[in-house]
Regions:
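RNA pseudouridine synthases
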Residues: 1-196
């Protein structure tokens, strides 16, 4: 299973006819079972500038999630404390601060529903380990296929129904808004919501 980094590095080498090793700066990552937008930098200067935008939260990340149960309301804000368990590679949700926890906030909106599922648009206000997965599970609407966080069944292929739909930021030099939108995965569950 070739890594996304290697695929992008090969693409840059071919597209820009780069001899030798190609610089590729990883600006941020997605959890392995998550699909969608990932931002890379082709130069060290771009990496520094883009990393600063992500560090200062001057980037808007919008996710789409298919959940198995009705969310608490049609739209809302989830605010909890998350604590990461390194051994289990899992985050636990608390209603109040506990030692080692960090505040986690996201907003969500129900975009559509099918007979069995709900499509949510999720905007992160903070960026914590497994934040969307843990908070939606704690709200009793786990992401489809996410066994780690309480989904009843896995998805075909092992992924989860969480998709980094859009990443928006200001170009660090041109001061123009950049929006990167990822097409939805080509599987039957996402096709239920292809008209959204």
């Amino acid at each position: 299973d070739e890594s996304l980094d290697n695929i992008v590095r090969s693409y840059i080498k071919e597209k820009y006819k780069k001899p030798g090793d190609v610089f590729l700066g990883v600006v941020h990552r997605l959890d392995r079972p998550v699909s969608g937008c990932v931002v890379y930098a082709r130069t060290s200067k771009a990496l520094s500038r883009l990393s600063e935008l992500f560090r200062t939260r001057d980037v808007k990340k919008t996710y789409w999630a298919i959940v198995t149960d009705r969310p608490p309301s049609e739209e809302g804000v989830l605010s909890n404390w998350l604590k990461k368990n390194e051994q289990q590679n899992k985050s636990y949700v608390y209603d109040k601060e506990v030692k080692g926890s960090k505040l986690a906030e996201l907003s969500y909106l129900v975009l559509a529903r099918s007979e069995k599922y709900y499509l949510l648009e999720v905007d992160l206000r903070t960026g914590r380990h497994h934040q969307i997965r843990a908070q939606l599970a704690a709200a009793k609407c786990p992401i489809k296929g996410d066994l780690k966080y309480g989904a009843p069944r896995s998805n075909e292929g092992g992924g989860i129904s969480l998709h980094s739909r859009k990443v928006t930021f200001m170009h660090p030099v041109k001061n123009e808004e950049i929006s990167v939108v990822a097409p939805l995965p080509e599987d039957r569950i996402w096709k239920l919501f292809s008209n959204v």
